Amino acid sequence: MGAPVLPAAFGFLASARTGGGRAPGPVFATRGSHTDIDTPQGERSLAATLVHAPSVAPDRAVARSLTGAPTTAVLAGEIYNRDELLSVLPAGPAPEGDAELVLRLLERYDLHAFRLVNGRFATVVRTGDRVLLATDHAGSVPLYTCVAPGEVRASTEAKALAAHRDPKGFPLADARRVAGLTGVYQVPAGAVMDIDLGSGTAVTHRTWTPGLSRRILPEGEAVAAVRAALEKAVAQRVTPGDTPLVVLSGGIDSSGVAACAHRAAGELDTVSMGTDTSNEFREARAVVDHLRTRHREITIPTTELLAQLPYAVWASESVDPDIIEYLLPLTALYRALDGPERRILTGYGADIPLGGMHREDRLPALDTVLAHDMATFDGLNEMSPVLSTLAGHWTTHPYWDREVLDLLVSLEAGLKRRHGRDKWVLRAAMADALPAETVNRPKLGVHEGSGTTSSFSRLLLDHGVAEDRVHEAKRQVVRELFDLTVGGGRHPSEVDTDDVVRSVADRTARGAA
């Protein structure tokens, strides 16, 4: 079963209260229409504001059940393994949307239902004085909460909770505190928080964790398994009758997704982004010509790219400068896409389970960094949909499909670094679908292909930051942008990157004196 063109809801701000009442006013970076819902259950209401594409009716993002205790679910994003999930439900009419599907699963499995779901979603469910907050296995739709006795607030954007922090939330031992936002916590990836509304106490149950064991497979079997898993994940993300759009760099990751999407849909649109100092247009063109896609190249001047740093921080709500460097060119690309809202597939994330960015030949060291990366991705928000929904588009990342991820992580390191090549098993899996030059092309990250890392460094150096202090200065710039936009409520258009860089450079110079 393919996906709808766009989810019923991109995000939400929800409030469950013992005394009823409206949810606080929404503050979203996501661009779209807002629809308010209120589902009174006596004095136990669940009120929410959904943000969704103007062309989409959000009805299927909300579901109510009157069997047993009245229950309401609100879901942002989408579920991919619908057919498998339907097969374990009792016979009857099919659920009308993903929110109703979650309710039906909860009736059968309670919170263990989330161990069955493969998707890109965040959800809040209320039944009586019980509130469930759940994320997908990767936390790819971030979910934040502020909990106090008698009230649970939850939002897919932390800034929505930052604007309403009275009363301050309880500490939550199993959730990550959001830096600078008192009482605001991020629900862990692959988890469901079971909250008692009356007391404000919470118990967190893990629904997915990265595997630590490794599988030894013959080359041919491993290659076939990777190809089949990726093709299935891409097909589940392609809407029947719609032409998908793939962000294409010309590397093996994005090109592999493009080849699978072309096979699933029969036709394909692609887009590549570069700057006036660096691009990968030639490499992408090799794939475009091979697959015969409708292609577009977008060039963003470096000064304009760096000026969009506030937007990248505002959208991702990340304070990690390395992650922001990865996300900045993507944020700029999505903002530059004109025309109607699009479903966009990316090759983002393949490097993490395959260890591609480490360029490590020693297998023990490769598996060590891979295990570390899989244990520490949570909270970085690399795949937050807000990076694209701030421009009205929906992105999805097949390499972080749960089945694909489980497979890639589990393969022994010698299948990832083999015959002197990084990501060997993926390259071999796509060898008959892509040009040889693409299959054999060495790894290059989007932040490198667009020159983002070097340009950000040059900006700081030009403001007098010593070379050995550049990374720390980047960290301070990103944190200040976070405090201004996410914590302080300022729109990125009101924040000047040069002013922030200048301020950080001055502080750095004074600290070094």
From Swiss-Prot:
Keywords: ATP-binding, Ligase, Magnesium, Metal-binding, Nucleotide-binding. It holds the Pfam family GATase_7. SUPFAM superfamilies: Adenine nucleotide alpha hydrolases-like, N-terminal nucleophile aminohydrolases (Ntn hydrolases). Its EC number is 6.3.3.4. It catalyses: N(2)-(2-carboxyethyl)-L-arginine + ATP = deoxyamidinoproclavaminate + AMP + diphosphate + H(+). Binds 1 Mg(2+) ion per subunit. InterPro entries: Asn_synthase, Asn_Synthetase, GATase_2_dom, Ntn_hydrolases_N, Rossmann-like_a/b/a_fold. It comes from the Bacteria. It is an enzyme of class 6 (ligase). Mg(2+) binds at residues 253, 351. Pathway: Antibiotic biosynthesis; clavulanate biosynthesis; clavulanate from D-glyceraldehyde 3-phosphate and L-arginine: step 2/8. One of its GO terms (molecular function) is asparagine synthase (glutamine-hydrolyzing) activity. Its cofactor is Mg(2+). GO terms for cellular component: cytosol. GO terms for biological process: asparagine biosynthetic process; clavulanic acid biosynthetic process. Homodimer. Belongs to the asparagine synthetase family. This is Carboxyethyl-arginine beta-lactam-synthase. It comes from Streptomyces clavuligerus. The gene is bls.
